[in-house]
């Protein structure tokens, strides 16, 4: 990472704010071509705003503390492990953070492969063996090395563009129809309140439905991150880490970082909206070597 992830929520919020500003100021495109250009600018804008703010938002949301100087043996081990694995993966040393949480979890984020952040919960450090913790860290390092955040941003930008475009196109038609406006250029000169209400509702609804696409991508990348971890530290360590996760309870990152957290349990949504495949499927994929080929 279905519980809408922080990345998706931020995109949705940016899209709605842009839509509100456009509607209130009357800055509305007068043609389909203009609408598409506007949708593209704002659609990708929302995605890249989320990407650029990702480290700050992630640390703020969990109360994470970046390790500047290790204060104990555990922090030294954590820094050494991240440094070693990042060198193996061919990326720059990420920032490393710890956050207070009883559950076993970790996440990676950042705008670039060489400017990333890896954070782990205190629950992970306390309840996992060193081998299992190494596998989880390698999973997050693999997310960074694979460029998953940037790829997610590009996919989200495309999805945002179509959500904004289709929502506002329908809103223009609805506003014109209800006001009796038959502007051949598709102008939104109809009822402005109808245009505003319809476009806001549709952007919200289509944005949630479009998360099916981004969640499919997230699930796909989880298999590859698991495989990346297996290459860095060994298949059995990653399998052991996933098996340990099966015994842990539901993570408490409250829907905010699930798209890139290691723990992907979900009971509230169907698999279409899950950011992670079920743990059993991930274990089976590792055992079969499907993503290691």
UniProtKB/Swiss-Prot annotation:
UniProt keyword annotations, A-Z: Cell inner membrane, Cell membrane, Hydrolase, Membrane, Metal-binding, Metalloprotease, Protease, Stress response, Transmembrane, Transmembrane helix, Zinc
Active-site residues, record numbering mapped to chain: 140
EC number of the protein: 3.4.24.-
Keyword 4Fe-4S: no
Localisation per UniProt entry: Cell inner membrane
Cofactor binding summary note: Binds 1 zinc ion per subunit.
GO biological process: proteolysis
Membrane topology, record value: Multi-pass membrane protein
Residues annotated for Zn(2+) binding in this entry: 139, 143, 222
Annotated Gene3D superfamilies: Metalloproteases ('zincins'), catalytic domain
MF (Gene Ontology): metalloendopeptidase activity; zinc ion binding
Transmembrane segment boundaries: 4-24, 34-54, 158-178, 193-213
Assigned GO CC terms: plasma membrane
Pfam family, one: Peptidase_M48
Cofactor(s) annotated in UniProt: Zn(2+)
Top-rank taxon, per record: Bacteria
Family: Belongs to the peptidase M48B family.
Protein name per its UniProtKB record: Protease HtpX
Organism: Yersinia enterocolitica serotype O:8 / biotype 1B (strain NCTC 13174 / 8081)
